A protein has these predicted regions:
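C-terminal motif of bacterial Sec signal peptides marking the signal peptidase cleavage site
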Residues: 11-15
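Bacterial signal peptide processing site
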Residues: 17-20
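Early extracytoplasmic/lumenal segment of secretory-pathway proteins
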Residues: 29-110
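Extracytoplasmic ligand-binding site segments that recognize negatively charged/polar headgroups
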Residues: 52-61, 86, 97, 102-246
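A ligand-binding cleft/hinge motif common to bilobed small-molecule-binding domains
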Residues: 107-110, 249-267
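Periplasmic-binding protein-like
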Residues: 130, 153, 216-225, 231, ...
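A bilobed periplasmic-binding-protein/Venus flytrap-type ligand-binding module shared by bacterial periplasmic
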Residues: 158-163, 202-205, 281-296, 312
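Mature extracytoplasmic/periplasmic domains
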Residues: 288-348
Length: 373
């Protein structure tokens, strides 16, 4: 699977009306004729009054949602989460009002096993044609039966050069206790068990998706050894606290760091993929099986796959796009950065997180022990 997924990214470097019965099209405030929608809005008579979008924090330009609302006459009810596990837990707890979600690759596999995703009607998503070909045959969902790739990226280290003195291009900077002690109270880790335990496993030379009890115990001990120097576990504002100076080192998603660093204008701040490697991932648009407004969700997916919109997304998130038609409009600042579009020699060292199967319970226990000790 790793080879197939890696090929997706290497080739990137080298190189959207349905039949369900949702509520009627929005009417004018005075109860008159329906609002005239743009050609990007599907069949107006089938659009619902609103669509509920559950997304990662800071993972879309808010202007895009406003544009969709104004063009299509549909209110976007927007909510955010901080990890795939939070998303899964929310849905398993009985949340049935969400129309569109964005699970990562390994979480798609889990949700498919649990019958949690609705099959897509491709006739409502003609902009699927805008995807890079390899993103139409992902190992976790060949043919985009249930999902549409949205963005892809990496997990690495954010840093303040004034404090570190050099680019911290190794996991040693995080997991070596003697080195971490130099930055006591100034290190942040993601509040994400797959990423943090995975990074510790990588530091130790193991698979980032290991379910071996001995290897996982070693990873736990490595994290506990540096926990006294960790200021916070944060998946929402890890970039903000680097910019503010509250921390000088952190583990986080590349685009999250790039967004806040770009806004700060501080040339001493940066993001690096460790030389040992790290996580590479693909996030995907998907519709929960319980979605009340699947047609409108498909129209929103198609809207997000528009080339102009796709470029606007990446120019805001600082993540790489699965949308080939959007690439010419993505800022060179994004496409030319090796931390966003890594070179082949870096890609070879990156891993996709894979489903843990029965090992999930062990990972859950170890994460609980890490957070509670």
């Amino acid at each position: 699977m790793l080879t197939s997924l890696l090929l997706i990214v290497v080739l990137l470097i080298s190189a959207c009306g349905g039949g369900n019965t949702e509520s009627a099209a929005p009417e004018a405030a005075d109860g008159g004729e329906p609002i005239v929608t743009s050609e990007r809005c599907g069949e107006p008579s089938q659009l619902s009054d609103s669509v509920s979008f559950y997304n990662w924090t800071d993972y879309i330009d808010p202007d895009i949602l406003t544009m969709f609302e104004e063009e299509c006459g549909v209110d976007v009810i927007y909510d955010t989460y901080s990890s795939n596990e939070d998303l899964l837990a929310k849905l398993q707890a009985g949340a049935t009002g969400y129309d569109l979600i964005i699970p990562s690759d390994y979480m798609v596999s889990i949700m498919l096993q649990l019958n949690m995703l609705k099959e897509l009607d491709h006739s409502n998503i003609p902009n699927l044609a805008n995807l890079y070909p390899r993103f139409t045959e992902t190992p976790y969902d060949p043919g985009n039966v249930y999902t549409v790739p949205y963005q892809w990226g990496t997990t690495g280290i954010g840093y303040n050069l004034e404090a570190t003195g050099e680019v911290p291009d190794s996991w040693d900077w995080i997991f070596d206790p003697e080195r971490a002690a130099q930055f006591e109270g100034q290190i942040s880790l993601l509040n994400d068990q797959r990423e943090v335990i995975g990074a510790a496993l990588k530091y130790l030379g193991y698979s980032m998706s290991s379910v071996d009890p001995t290897e996982l115990e070693a990873a736990k001990q490595a994290i506990l050894a540096i926990k006294p120097y960790v200021a916070t576990f944060d998946s929402d504002s890890f970039g903000d606290i680097l910019v503010s100076g509250d921390v000088v080192l952190g583990v986080g998603w590349g685009g999250g760091y790039y967004q806040d660093i770009a806004e700060s204008g501080n040339d001493n701040l940066g993001y690096v993929i460790p030389q040992e490697g790290g996580t590479i991932w693909t996030d995907n648009l998907a519709i929960p099986a319980t979605a009340p407004n699947p047609y409108t969700a498909e129209v929103l997916i198609n809207y997000l796959l528009d080339p102009e919109i796709g470029a606007k997304i990446s120019n805001f998130t600082y993540y790489a796009s699965a949308n080939q038609a959007a690439e010419p409009m993505i800022d060179e600042e994004v496409t030319g950065d090796p931390g966003i579009y890594p070179p082949p020699e870096t890609l070879e060292k990156l891993e996709f997180l894979t489903e843990l199967g029965e090992g999930t319970l062990l990972w859950d226990r170890i994460w609980t022990e890490i957070k509670s000790e």
